[in-house]
Amino acid sequence: MLKKAVGIVIRRVAYGDNHLIITFLNEAGVKVALMARNARKSTKYGSGLDLFYENLFIFSQFKGMGTLSSVDTINSHYEIREDIYVMTYAQYVVELIDRALEEDETNPYAYQLLKVALTHMERSDKARLIALLVSIKCMPLYGYVPNFKYSTYDGNMTHKDFIAYSFQFNSVVTQEALIEDPHAIPMTNKSLYMLYLLSEVPIESLSSINIEQSLIDEMETLVYKMYDEFIGVFIKSRKILEQMRRLDNYK
């Protein structure tokens, strides 16, 4: 019996000389793995099995991995591939969401997050900001929730008083907390406030947000440290992005 599902390709792996195993995230937020037979030697599927493609997949599946029958492309997100930075940030977003979900998990929000992020990357020049926002939105999927709203040290909720982020207290903190946690990460007040806004804003509202590059740099550094400290997931495309930026700075 054939099944139909709309989804976005998030992973593809060569299998033998002729075949591909592709994984797509469907609208219900479920990862579906399919064998695409002879996909490496045939033009049957066109480019529809490439990363970022949103397709209507037709496949057979009883238990375990299914077998792909055909794909009908809805959106190729072609523009993402025209810029190496945008493409790598898109790969980062895909990998981050993929790693956050168990193979049998259902999470419609993850699909919506991925779809909106790719659409915005395709239509704007904010790939790095979009990736930052997705990084923040994905943290709860990994079981970690940062606190940019108030200081758990003293309950202070006045944003203009925050000067650092404390891993010890897992929250923004004021000057007083530095006595207890001298290793809190110093941050500009503005970047901490922007992190609070980004953690609260729906991703659909991203197109209306403009943030200066220096703040994005500062926020990204903190978010990466949070992933290293609390989540511990290795994202290959993040390392590639860091290497690319180092090369640009060297030039």
Curated annotation (Swiss-Prot):
Which cysteines does the record link by disulfide bonds? none
Single GO biological process annotation from the record: DNA recombination
Q: Which SUPFAM superfamilies match?
A: ArfGap/RecO-like zinc finger, Nucleic acid-binding proteins
For whether the record's keyword set contains Magnesium, the answer is no
Query: According to its UniProt entry, what is the function of this protein?
Result: Involved in DNA repair and RecF pathway recombination.
Family statement: Belongs to the RecO family.
* Identification of the protein by name: DNA repair protein RecO
User: Organism source for this protein?
Assistant: Macrococcus caseolyticus (strain JCSC5402)
Origin organism lineage: Bacteria, Bacillati, Bacillota, Bacilli, Bacillales
Q: Which gene encodes it?
A: recO
